[in-house]
Regions:
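Sec-dependent bacterial lipoprotein signal peptides
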Residues: 1-19
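Extracellular glycan-modifying ectodomains
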Residues: 21-357
Length: 357
């Protein structure tokens, strides 16, 4: 769905047509000329119906508390678009797709932040925040070389009244990640597993990063999150390799009941480890997927376990290998870049991704 920022271009194109017939940081600009390859846009493979984007959104501006903003009992970080940085991210994902042609299909999931889903467009404009729907469109329109866009902004916006993001933490919930999994399956042309088919584990009294960043805001402290995790049915076993190279058996979803109140998000895939493997004993079809992620990908990975024989995960901030080599070594079919929008516009994160290609 193209948004306001494309309206002028579309109008101009229509005018020219009639005449011819006779009748994803602060916003930056870039003077770089896109290459021919970069202009060959990979269109999103899914489409979603039109809807009232501002329905059920927050209509009043949040207030500052510590380094974040508060609205009611919810915390929010901010988002600013950098065109030059985001273009570099698109080039990086497209480079991965180009180098893996004939080996694996590369998918990209750009995850909006909560402020871009919960607040009305008018409030976001008032706060000086970039429109994340427009940024997601920008990213998907600048993927090339066969990289496949998995659009999730509209889906999340349509489900905005559900528990998609934590109140006291900057991450999305497993439910938000599930909707991204559904969209990935649509992009891949397969049927997603129904949410009701998963068993769950629930961890109460989660007070995440926003609680600390707000200076222990009372409203947040009085509204701790409940974390619901969905367990794969095929296996809950995995291994991770830590930053010292030690391989440790672990759980895809670990019982975080006794974790500290701020660490419960680490129930997913052992937290932020450089490298992880999950092997599904119920499949023998050779299917394999690699997820290239930062911490937002942690809640997403468990939904892939039942669909592939092998699931590999790298956190590009800490991994020191080459995903190009890894795909060839492990026979990986699909590569999924899963990044929140702040990561897609942060030079250090983009450099980390480029380092492991």
């Amino acid at each position: 769905m193209k948004r306001k920022w494309l309206a002028a271009l579309l109008a101009a194109s229509l005018l020219l047509s009639l005449t011819g017939c006779g009748g994803g940081d602060s916003t930056e600009s870039t003077s770089q000329t896109l290459s021919q390859s970069e202009q060959e846009v990979t269109q999103p493979v899914t489409s979603e119906p039109e809807y009232n984007e501002d329905a059920d959104t927050i209509q009043t501006a949040p207030v500052k508390s510590g380094t974040i903003y508060i609205s009611g009992d919810r915390g929010y970080s901010t988002y600013g678009f950098s065109e030059s940085n985001t273009l570099e991210y698109c080039r990086t994902v497209s480079q991965a797709a180009r180098e893996l042609q004939g080996v694996a299909t590369v998918y990209n999931i750009a995850v909006p932040l909560a402020c871009g889903i919960d607040f009305s467009n008018a409030v976001q404009e008032e706060m000086g925040w970039s429109n994340q729907g427009e940024v997601c469109d920008f990213i998907y329109d600048h993927l090339t070389d066969g990289a496949v866009a998995v659009p999730i902004y509209d889906t999340l916006r349509q489900h905005k009244t559900e528990y998609l993001y934590f109140r006291t933490d900057h991450h999305w919930t497993a439910l938000g990640a599930y909707y991204a999994y559904q969209q990935f399956c649509q992009a891949k042309g397969v049927e997603p597993k129904a949410l009701e088919d998963y068993e769950t584990m629930t961890f109460d009294n989660f007070l995440g990063s926003y609680y600390e960043d707000s200076g222990n805001n009372t409203a947040l402290g009085n509204a701790p999150d409940t974390l619901v995790a969905y367990l794969p049915s095929s296996t809950n076993e995995m291994t991770f390799t830590d930053r010292n190279g030690t391989v440790t058996p672990w759980k895809v979803v670990y019982d975080a009941t006794n974790y500290s109140r701020g660490a419960k998000y680490n129930c997913f895939i052992g937290g932020d480890q450089p490298y992880e493997e999950i092997h599904n004993p119920t499949l023998n079809d050779g299917s394999a997927v690699l997820v290239v992620k930062e911490s937002f990908g942690n809640a997403f990975v468990p939904f892939l376990v039942d669909d592939y024989q092998d699931v590999y995960v790298v956190d590009y901030r800490y991994y020191n290998g080459s995903i190009n080599d890894l795909c060839r070594e492990k026979g990986i079919d699909d590569v999924i870049f899963c990044n929140n929008l702040n990561a897609t516009g942060t030079p250090s994160r983009i450099s980390d991704m480029q380092r492991i290609l």
